[in-house]
Amino acid sequence: MKFGPNTTQIYIPLDLQINILLRLPVKSLLRFRCVSKLWCSIITSHDFRNRHFNITSSSAPPRLLIAFQDFYGEKLLLVSSPNPNVSSSSTSSCCVPYKDLSKVEINGRKVYNAVWGLTCFESRLKVGICNPSTRELHMFPQIKFKNYPDIFPCIMYFLGYDRIEDQYKVLAIDNLPWRLEYKVVPILRASRKDKGSPNISIIVSFDVRSETYKNSNVPSKLLPMDTSDNFWTANCNCFIGDKTLINYNGKIGVVEKPQHGRFRMWVVEDAEKEEWSMNTFYLPQSASGLDFKVMNTFYTGEICLVTEKISDPFCLFYYNLKTNSMRSVTYEGLLHMATFKQALQFSVSYHYESLVSLET
């Protein structure tokens, strides 16, 4: 570095440089790869990527990933947003400025889930993985099943991550009414129909590392379902008719669609004994008249709700299960594109910024 007429070189130890870089956001690190070959080598290394992810995921709350499918079902808008943590009260609300949003538009039909910085989506009968932070994506060859119909195929995909082996895996599910076939298995949960037992619903837990699964029965008296409703839909959580399968404090939870200002939630208290608990929650009067559906649960102990009809400005509602209060977050200018104002589907999930590269 130059100071006055003399040239003075300041030496910064490599360990200190790395520690400084580890605390920078992904956007800055992508630019700093061009500073020098040394920095590029450091930032793109496997060890640095993992250390950076561990630091950012433990020191700051996760961001939100809001995915919109356009009116024509051809493009996806992925929006990464800061996660406003507002003290819950029935009247609390806040607004996220448009400038704070990170947006990526990709060719795709549906977003399935987001896992440790990556997002799984479908595009023209193929499955793809996208890193919204680096804007990289990778498309896999079409996955085919035996004796599968060419017209209106019914395949769903989920992304899983094995932290011990540091390996991402994609699960492809053949969801034909008369069979259920798996190609790859991650640790995600969903409900399936057991052929020959239309009144029995099953929770299937998948393990990413061992690629094995186990079943747990759902008591019909707690969760009655008919055969027409017993299907999955693709999201970071799973919909079963008018009910949503969620992760509630590490336990399996099922939340029904709010109706008449209230909703019920079932939670598995003992998976081995198949013991369930049920609680009824009441929405505040300020939410009366709004038609909600459940999207997900978050680390704050809140359930994310959205209105069935997308509005501009776009708004998310958070219901606190402990205080029975609700807050709202508004995103102004988010749906300025005409094709996304009439989005067919949308989802909300956690998102952690990651440097993981999808280049092959």
UniProtKB/Swiss-Prot annotation:
InterPro entries: F-box-assoc_dom_typ3, F-box-assoc_interact_dom, F-box-like_dom_sf, F-box_dom. Coiled coil: none annotated. CDD domains: F-box_AtFBW1-like. SMART domains: FBOX. Residues 6-56 form the F-box domain. This is Putative F-box protein At3g47150. It comes from Arabidopsis thaliana. The lineage of its organism: Eukaryota, Viridiplantae, Streptophyta, Embryophyta, Tracheophyta.
